């Protein structure tokens, strides 16, 4: 009864419990090793390794152009809970695509929930990626009226949590 209505803990939570028990790196140390600007060519070469591109820009910017296979979790909003839900593995190596001037903020906010394996960020953002011939993907955004008048062979997938659905 006491726990009724509470959300399940995020998937990264057990890892954070271990971090709290065993200790973790100082914030300055994490920032120093993570705050690395990477050229588009360097990022492209790293895609062959097991790295995850985390795009933390606005949903509008991500929709217009993003690196194929990148994961979108915008800095504005419920960043930490979504990071924990989507990324799960705190040991993942991350490369950031961030709004200019907010790279350090993203690194700090990731480290607060145990994700401190940021390799660096894409220098010059997505425009440098495009300028250097990098492939991009786009997301089609439609209004409800556009969706309802378009092809009837579409399905809606509700991905809200139980608590979100109730409200």
What are these regions (language model features)?
Residues 115-129:
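A short glycine-rich beta-strand->turn/loop micro-motif centered on a GG-aromatic cluster
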Residues 79, 119, 162-167:
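Short polar/charged helix/loop
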Residues 130-155, 160-165:
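Active-site neighborhoods of enzymes that stabilize oxyanions during catalysis
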Residues 1-53, 57-93, 99, 103-104, ...:
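Accessory terminal helices/loops
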Residues 53, 121, 156-158:
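Short beta-strand "acidic-cap" motif of Rossmann-like dinucleotide-binding folds
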